[in-house]
Each structure stands twice: as structure tokens, then as C-alpha cells.
Amino acid sequence: MLWVLVGTVLPVMLLAAPPPINKLALFPDKSAWCEAKNITQIVGHSGCEAKSIQNRACLGQCFSYSVPNTFPQSTESLVHCDSCMPAQSMWEIVTLECPGHEEVPRVDKLVEKIVHCSCQACGKEPSHEGLNVYMQGEDGPGSQPGSHSHSHPHPGCQTPEPEEPPGAPQVEEEGAED
């Protein structure tokens, strides 16, 4: 029974991401930090009027290190990487008006609204959990994103880096000079 438990739990523990590192022995006076900074985000789409919204961006310094290997390798490689990224976010629909486009007078864009940031493992797979609510919709599969006018918070939700479509959103830090 004990061997079954060890054989099941041990591999899961080994695959789990290590906890973030706040201090390193080589630099005891330095600490990792990561915070959500207020920004003004410009949301745009080709042929539509852009909108400015208030959002947050993750900014910080998290630890990473790599210890040189040996060959043949006698121990496991000592590599660690943390990155400042969203720890809690939600999705919000931003509707853009598209004057002169009768067939598509408006476009709904899903925007990730960052609530909280923290140092997390660099290779951590993003969760699409918050996005699935809009893709599946509360009205069933195939519902359009515009059918929901509220956002859904998802603690611990990680989101993918958005692709850069034509007229992609621009991010300006609040208080930045023009």
C-alpha cells in the first residue's frame, strides 16, 4: 500500500512547479518583487474607433538562475526561472464602434483585466478557463462573446499572450509623457 502511494504521489510532486524564490543566498540583500501597475490600454481593431480603458500590467523582478552542468551529468540540472505575471485576472468585453461598416457596425474584443500579479514559474502553462466562459457561453456552444455584458473573475487564472492583429492594442503607462 505504501509503495502504491509513493509511486503515485512522488511523480506528481516532482512535476509540480517549484515555489517562487524570494531571496538567494548569493544576494541576501535583494528580494524578488512583482506588482500590478495601473496603465491606460488602447484597444483597437482595423476599421473601428479605438477605445482607452484602465487596466494593469505586471511589472517586477523575479529570480532565475542556472548552475553549469557536468558531463556525464551526475546530478539533476540546477535551473530555475520565475517571471512576474498575472496571478488573478478576469475577462471584460470592450465594444468598438465601426462607422461605415454596415455589415459589422461594432466589434466585441475580449480584454484580460489584471487584478493581481506575482512571481511564478516561467514555464507555467496558461489556463484558458476564463476565456472558455465566453467561447462556450452561458447560452450554449457557439454563443458570441458579445452576449455577455459582465466579467468573470478567475483566481489563479493565467492567460496566453494575445496575437498581434492589425490595429493591435497599444499599452501606455499611466502618467507617461507623450
UniProtKB/Swiss-Prot annotation:
One of its GO terms (biological process) is nervous system development. Its main location: secreted. One of its GO terms (molecular function) is morphogen activity. Residues 130-178 are annotated as: Disordered. InterPro entries: Cys_knot_C, Cystine-knot_cytokine, DAN, Neuroblast_suppress_tumour_1. Most abundant in lung, brain, intestine and kidney. Disulfide bonds join C34-C84, C48-C98, C58-C117, C62-C119, C81-C122. GO terms for cellular component: extracellular space. It is found in: Secreted. Residues 34-123 form the CTCK domain. Homodimer. Possible candidate as a tumor suppressor gene of neuroblastoma. May play an important role in preventing cells from entering the final stage (G1/S) of the transformation process. PANTHER family: GREMLIN 1, NEUROBLASTOMA SUPPRESSOR OF TUMORIGENICITY 1. This is Neuroblastoma suppressor of tumorigenicity 1. The gene is Nbl1.
